[in-house]
């Protein structure tokens, strides 16, 4: 595939995991270090509107967020004009998946998830970063803990979609 040819050699695409209006997420295998990763690839039109410099700036800001309940960004790049970033592959379900299959969650578990997500948001806010797209599909479960995905990148994507500039 064209995307595979454009990605750095250390990544081998395994399968598409999710597709949205502005991006696709792939399971990939990284060769060094050897591990499974998720690669989020932005739509080409959105990549062009966003611009490499703005994207890199947002990824650099987001990559500074080191918190147990925030999905880290390992790397980012430009694959033939298509912007992408690499994060850990999290095999667990999203909160959206759990709510769809289980309905209401027990109150104690709901409170635990809320505390973990609030801790992640507080950490980011302390660093001047706002998620702006917090929703059940961006809350994933890893080893029984809630982790927030797409941190900071949502701000860049919304700005590019609307033609606006970044704000704090």
For each feature predicted by the language model, list its residue ranges:
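Conserved ATP-binding/catalytic core of the eukaryotic-like protein kinase fold
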Residues: 1-168
């Amino acid at each position: 595939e064209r995307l595979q040819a454009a990605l750095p050699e250390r990544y081998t695409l395994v399968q598409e995991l999710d597709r949205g209006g502005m991006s696709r997420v792939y399971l990939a295998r990284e060769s060094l270090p050897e591990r499974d990763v998720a690669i989020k690839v932005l739509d080409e039109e959105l990549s062009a509107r966003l611009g490499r410099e703005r994207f890199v700036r947002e990824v650099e800001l987001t990559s500074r967020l080191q918190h147990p309940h925030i999905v880290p960004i390992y790397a980012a790049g430009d694959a033939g004009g298509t912007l992408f970033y690499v994060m850990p592959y999290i095999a667990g379900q999203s909160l959206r998946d759990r709510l769809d299959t289980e309905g209401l969650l027990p109150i104690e578990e709901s409170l635990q998830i809320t505390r973990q997500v609030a801790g992640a948001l507080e950490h980011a806010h302390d660093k001047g970063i706002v998620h702006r797209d917090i929703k059940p599909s961006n809350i994933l479960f890893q080893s029984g803990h809630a982790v927030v995905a797409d941190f900071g990148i949502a701000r860049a994507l919304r700005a590019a979609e609307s033609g606006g500039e970044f704000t704090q």
